[in-house]
Amino acid sequence: MALPILLDCDPGHDDAIAIVLALASPELDVKAITSSAGNQTPEKTLRNVLRMLTLLNRTDIPVAGGAVKPLMRELIIADNVHGESGLDGPALPEPAFAPQNCTAVELMAKTLRESAEPVTIVSTGPQTNVALLLNSHPELHSKIARIVIMGGAMGLGNWTPAAEFNIYVDPEAAEIVFQSGIPVVMAGLDVTHKAQIHVEDTERFRAIGNPVSTIVAELLDFFLEYHKDEKWGFVGAPLHDPCTIAWLLKPELFTSVERWVGVETQGKYTQGMTVVDYYYLTGNKPNATVMVDVDRQGFVDLLADRLKFYA
């Protein structure tokens, strides 16, 4: 039986490719997709979900827009990474359908209530929508199997020296998620920076030759340009968000550890930092499965294989 998942995202090039991977995988049953502000403004990220589902001919999936700003802060967006639209590069179709007439949290709650089995929440943007769901619907916590997030880092940040972007946008929300008591799986920069797509991988995807693989290659063409900056020291572009979906499909591609994770919300230099108790120094029981390594070639092969689904 396919694993029921609820995807909360802020497309974003890598979010878009996570959607592509999830919907090409019969092992997963995508019950709904909600959008959050983050990589772009809330209006643009919602539109990008609708555009991607139109491209993939999956207008049957319920979609709802989420919080327009973090719980306690002003919104920060990553338009320098993802462009004016949030998905700059390819020519994507206009949305062929409308979102549900409800909020992201309402759609999430409805999805959980109606599911016969616990649902896995996959969150690849700021954690605002998920935190609002957890705070407003404690009676539904038992309907959540786990929360798989792209966010955080044990080591270096990518938005500040200490913080990864998704967590930095709304650290208070991320702290709610990590301390919720629900199993959390963290795909942080320690693993996603190893999940790099090289130019030759992009050409491999393009050569598959279907409309979706072509769009994915064009998304990566744009994403690769930003990551050419020598400060990163990358060979290619880190494909952050699809690591969450790949972990659900093939966890054997990843190395992970069980550790306690907290989020710094006050520090002068460290706001948004995910504090991972790697050496068990706090005495706190582990609350997260933290990915630390990936079989890069296996990850690329998985994506290439699933892109053939769209032939």
Curated annotation (Swiss-Prot):
Write down the Gene3D superfamilies for this protein, in alphabetical order: Ribonucleoside hydrolase-like (3.90.245.10)
Which keywords are on file for this protein? Glycosidase, Hydrolase
* Pfam families attached to this UniProt entry: IU_nuc_hydro (PF01156)
Entry's Gene Ontology BP terms? nucleobase-containing small molecule interconversion; purine nucleoside catabolic process; pyrimidine nucleobase metabolic process
PROSITE patterns on file? IUNH
GO MF entry, a single one: uridine nucleosidase activity
CDD domains (UniProt xref): nuc_hydro_IU_UC_XIUA (cd02651)
Key word RNA-binding present: no
Q: Which GO terms describe its cellular component?
A: cytosol
Q: Which domain of life is it from?
A: Bacteria
Q: What is the protein's name according to its record?
A: Pyrimidine-specific ribonucleoside hydrolase RihA
